[in-house]
Amino acid sequence: MKISNVVNIDDMAVAARRYLPRIAFDYIDGGVDGEAALARNRQAFDRYKLLPRYLVDIEKRSQATRLFGHDYAAPFGICPMGIAGFFRPGADLMLARAAARFGVPYVMSSASCDSIDAAMEQAPQTTWFQIYGTRDTNITMDLIRRAKALDVRVLMLTIDTPVMAKRERNMRNGFRRPMKMTPSVILQGLSRPAWTLRYLAKGGIPMMENWRPYAGEGATANDVADLFGTETPAPAQTWDVLKLVRKAWPGPLVVKGVLHPDDALKCLEMGADGLVVSNHGGRQLDSAPAPMDMLPVIADAVGGRMELLIDSGFRRGSDIAKALCLGAKAALFGRPAMFGVAAGGEAGACKVLDIFRQEFSLVMGQMGWTEVGQAGPDCLLDLANPLAPARHDDPVS
C-alpha cells in the first residue's frame, strides 16, 4: 500500500505489515502473553461516547497545548520506543524531525538506535528523553547528565518494567538477543527484500547509540544490547530510584507506567511534575487494566496538582478527545508512529501525525470546541455509568 493511499492508522499498519518481515512487524504489533491487555486498551475507548454540541461558531479552532511550561501545536505526541532503527535505519531521527515539523513532543527512548545528541541537534524544541532505572545507577546518572548538558526540556522515567515480559509472538518468530539467523528468520527476510536490503546495507543489527559509551571501546551492537539487557530490568529498584532521579534532574520530570492512584500520589509527593498513565501498550502485564479505565481515578486522586499524559491504544482523533475529557493534558502513541516510519520513513511518520491532527480537528468541530481546554467530563457519556446528556444549569435542555 502506498503511503499516499493511507487514510487511517489501520491502513498504516497494513502498509507496515507489507514492508516488514513478520519478526519485525510482530515485535511492534504484539503484546504480552495472550494479548488480552492489548485488546482491552482498544475496548476501553468504547466505554465512552462523545456528546456533540451544535450551533456553535467553530470556524477557528486551535489545538494549541501547553505542557510543562512549553507550548505545543497539538495535545498529542510520540511516546518512547526502543530499537526503532531495526525497523528502518535512521527511524529515531525521522520521528524526531516529523514531531518537530508538527510541533508536538517526541520522547526519545534511551534504547534508541540514534543518539539523544543527534535528536537534540535536529529537533531541540520538541525532543524529550526517556530513561530506565538501571542496576548500575552510575549509568542512569550519566544519562541524566548528558540530557542536562543538551538542554533537554523534559525527562521521562519509565517504572513499569521491573521484570522481562513473556511476549509470545517474539518467542515464536525468533526475535531474541543475540539475533540468530535461523532458517525461519532467513525466510522471513527473503519474503521482504526491500526491508532486508536496507537492513544489510546498514550492517545488520543497529547500535543502541545512547548506551554505546558504557560498553567499552570497540563494543559491537550485540555487546551494547547485552549490556542493556544486563542493566535492565532492575528488579531490586524501589522508590529510591525516583528520589535519585528527582535530585539529579532540575527540569520537568515525568513518571511513565503509573496505573494505581496511590502510586500517582507517591510520585506527586516525591516531586514528579507529571505522569504517563500507561500499561506499556499491553506489553508487560496481560491482566493490567487499560489506562483509559484508570485515568479518571488518577485524575481525581492528584486533583490537578500534576500534569497527566496517557498512552496505550490510541488510534483515532476521537480517542485523544476522550482522554482529554477524562483529565489528560495530552495523549502519546507509539505503534502508529512506528508503523508510519517503518512503512514510509519520515513521510510515513508525518502522515500519521497529520491523520491524528485532522481527525482531532474534525472532532473538535463536532464537539463545539474552539480550544482544547473546553474538553471535560460533561462532554462524555459513560456507558458504564450513564448520565443525562445536559447538565441542570445548561440553558438549553
Regions found by a protein language model. Give the residues of each.
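Alpha/beta catalytic cores of nucleotide-metabolism and tRNA/nucleoside-modifying enzymes
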Residues: 1-46, 293-310, 315-397
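Glycine-rich active-site/cofactor-binding loop and its immediate structural neighborhood
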Residues: 73-111
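A gly/proline- and charged-residue-enriched helix-loop-helix capping module
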Residues: 100-122, 126-140
